[in-house]
């Protein structure tokens, strides 16, 4: 009986050690490719239609894709970003925001608009 408990305990300790090592490896792993190396954009039309793009090699390419995806001749870029972008809306207006995280981009857009809600977002 004592041998069985000892083996179970050794196994549990070994599993815990492997789990800790795996968690440390995941925690310390380098971040994926720099978000600053790619661009995204969000474009809006006066009728509320929008287009988004992300993971483009240049700002111009990201903006052109967002405008094209929007699909209307009056589409204009509201925000361009390297990490995350969001667009806040209310009954009267739309406002773009950017940030290093989605939460930061949403907060930026809502702050610039003075309230409202998040209509769309994208991150690289």
Curated annotation (Swiss-Prot):
Keywords: Signal. Pfam families: DUF4189 (PF13827). Predicted to be exported by the Tat system. The position of the signal peptide cleavage has not been experimentally proven. Residues 1-35 form the signal peptide. It comes from Mycobacterium tuberculosis (strain ATCC 25618 / H37Rv). This is Protein Rv1269c. The keyword Signal applies. One of its GO terms (cellular component) is extracellular region. To M.tuberculosis Rv1813c. PROSITE patterns: TAT (PS51318).
């Amino acid at each position: 009986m004592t041998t069985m408990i000892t083996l179970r305990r050794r196994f549990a300790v070994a599993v815990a050690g492997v789990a800790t090592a795996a968690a440390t490896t995941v925690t310390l792993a380098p971040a994926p490719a720099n978000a600053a190396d790619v661009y995204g954009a969000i474009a809006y039309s006066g009728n509320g239609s929008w287009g988004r793009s992300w993971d483009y090699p240049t700002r111009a390419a990201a903006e052109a894709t967002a405008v094209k995806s929007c699909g209307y001749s009056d589409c204009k870029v509201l925000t361009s970003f390297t990490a995350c972008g969001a667009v806040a809306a209310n009954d009267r207006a739309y406002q773009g925001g950017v940030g290093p995280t989605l939460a930061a981009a949403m907060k930026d857009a809502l702050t610039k608009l003075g309230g409202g809600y998040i209509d769309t977002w994208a991150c690289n």
